[in-house]
Regions:
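N-proximal low-complexity "stem/linker" segments adjacent to membrane-targeting elements
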Residues: 1-27
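Conserved nucleotide-sugar donor-binding catalytic segment
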Residues: 147-227
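Flexible acidic/His/Gly-enriched loops in nucleotide-sugar-dependent glycosyltransferase catalytic domains
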Residues: 66-86, 108-174, 240-244
């Protein structure tokens, strides 16, 4: 049962985002919903973002400073950061937030009220407002639908749009623990949406735009997802291998789709 004002945990992972981290943190502190804690994980930054995080004097903010990276893959380091931040958190609802993104003022309040109205909900996601910092242009985008006879999983929104019931997030992290050191091209948003799509019946994508999603040229948001070349097909095969491993872990039968065979063939073509 939820208490009147349940505690919310916002998990922020940061690596060298000095241009965005202050706006990110302030967007959390300025939330209209006040019963929050903010866990900031700095992953060995060497720019001014680390200094800013150290300077924050607010009882709502808890800080973790990683001393060394464990993986060459940024996605695996992100997963490690979120796992360690979650262990430090106490909230009943867990929000994920990349340090180059931000929340609109009423996001947490809207999500909490939605969870309260439907206590069976395990996962919520809103739509992102794409922000292009070089021009300060912003645009709203909505998820496209897929014909799933040709696709194994649906389109999904980025990490910073995601929120989980604590018990469900804990279960998710435990059940994908086989992948903690594998599938280096997969960010946590891909792992989460695949897990949720196949193994949760209680999730919802809100028709709301409550997250600023920064198209950071330093990050993964622009270059890697639009070019459907060899790297794109290789990453897609890794996603399929993750799905198979997840089904094996869950002791469920997995049937390969047309999408899998097309992806496999394209990898063979590029390999040759």
């Amino acid at each position: 049962m939820y208490q009147k004002d349940i505690l919310v945990s916002i998990l922020i992972n940061n690596y060298n985002n000095e241009s965005f981290i202050k706006k990110c943190v302030q967007s959390c502190l300025n939330q209209s919903y006040k019963n929050i804690e903010i866990i900031i994980f700095d992953d060995v930054s060497f720019d001014k973002s680390k200094k800013y995080i150290k300077s924050i004097k607010n009882e709502k903010v808890k800080k973790i400073f990683n001393k060394k990276k464990y993986f060459k893959s940024g996605r695996l380091n992100q997963l490690n950061a979120i796992k360690r931040s979650f262990l430090k958190s106490k909230g009943e609802i867990i929000f994920l937030l990349d340090s180059d993104d931000a929340f609109l003022k009423n996001k947490v309040k809207y999500f909490v009220n939605t969870f309260k109205k439907n206590k069976k909900l395990e996962f919520l996601q809103d739509n992102p407002i794409y922000h292009y910092p070089n021009t300060n242009f912003k645009e709203k985008k909505i998820l496209k639908s897929k014909k799933l006879v040709f696709h194994t999983w649906p389109y999904f929104n980025p990490t910073s749009t995601m929120a989980f019931q604590r018990h469900f997030f804990d279960k998710f992290l435990k059940e994908i623990s086989f992948s903690n050191k594998k599938f280096g091209t997969m960010a946590i948003d891909a792992r989460a949406i695949i897990y949720i799509y196949f193994f949760s019946k209680n999730f919802k994508i809100l028709n709301k735009y409550l997250t600023i999603y920064t198209q950071n040229v330093r990050g993964y948001t622009i270059s890697e997802y639009n070019n459907k070349g060899a790297a794109w097909w290789k990453r897609r095969l890794e996603f399929h291998n993750f799905v198979q491993s997840l089904f094996f872990k869950k002791k469920k039968t997995y049937y390969k789709s047309l999408d899998y065979y097309l992806t496999y063939i394209m990898n063979m073509i590029y390999k040759n």
